[in-house]
Amino acid sequence: MLPPALNIPKWLEANSHLLQPPVNNYCVYHPSSPATAGYTVMIVGGPNARTDYHINTTPEFFYQYRGSMLLKTVDTSVSPPVFQDIPIHEGSIFLLPANTPHCPVRFKDTVGVVMEQPRAEGAVDQMRWYCRGCGEIVWEKQFVCTDLGTQVKEVVEEFGADQEKRTCKACGTIAETRFKEGEIVQPPRFVE
């Protein structure tokens, strides 16, 4: 028998406490569940101001349920890479192409839904930090994704605990693990 539809407002009423830093997400449909055909569906809350960029071998679908978010991306198909901020407003959707470095910045009292396709067996995810001084890669780690929530947290904590990993080899700038308060401006809630 198929499970019932998930009512987002009711789910949030009962479970919003599960959306905790540093990842702020909860997997409502896990890829190992038979009914999901391998898809991962997460409810993600704010605030989340991590500076890492995630690289996934499959596209990611974003639906912004409440409030607005900013999806920081890097186009690595050109040289030098181009940094682009994509606002995703309440009620909006966005499909991020596979292998696009992205840093989702979520603000207080915002909620979104993210859906990921099944990864190929042995597919490698990456977490990457870029230098905010010169744009070079400061540090990155590759891993086979089996549990996004716990693995991302572990990589973020590993990076944050090691100043050598956080130091840019090109210019010496020390990368932070979080944006400073007020450094990122929240896009308008709705499309203007």
Swiss-Prot record:
Pathway: Cofactor biosynthesis; NAD(+) biosynthesis; quinolinate from L-kynurenine: step 3/3. This is 3-hydroxyanthranilate 3,4-dioxygenase 1. GO terms for cellular component: cytoplasm. O2 binds at residue 50. GO terms for biological process: 'de novo' NAD biosynthetic process from L-tryptophan; anthranilate metabolic process; L-tryptophan catabolic process; quinolinate biosynthetic process. One of its GO terms (molecular function) is 3-hydroxyanthranilate 3,4-dioxygenase activity. InterPro entries: 3hydroanth_dOase (IPR010329), RmlC-like_jellyroll (IPR014710), RmlC_Cupin_sf (IPR011051). Keywords: Cytoplasm, Dioxygenase, Iron, Metal-binding, Oxidoreductase, Pyridine nucleotide biosynthesis. Substrate binds at residues 60, 106, 116. The keyword tRNA processing does not apply. Belongs to the 3-HAO family. A divalent metal cation binds at residues 131, 134, 168, 171. Catalyzes the oxidative ring opening of 3-hydroxyanthranilate to 2-amino-3-carboxymuconate semialdehyde, which spontaneously cyclizes to quinolinate. It comes from the Eukaryota. It is found in: Cytoplasm. HAMAP family: 3_HAO. It holds the Pfam family 3-HAO. Its EC number is 1.13.11.6. Its cofactor is Fe(2+). Fe cation binds at residues 54, 60, 102. Disulfide bonds: none annotated. It catalyses: 3-hydroxyanthranilate + O2 = (2Z,4Z)-2-amino-3-carboxymuconate 6-semialdehyde.
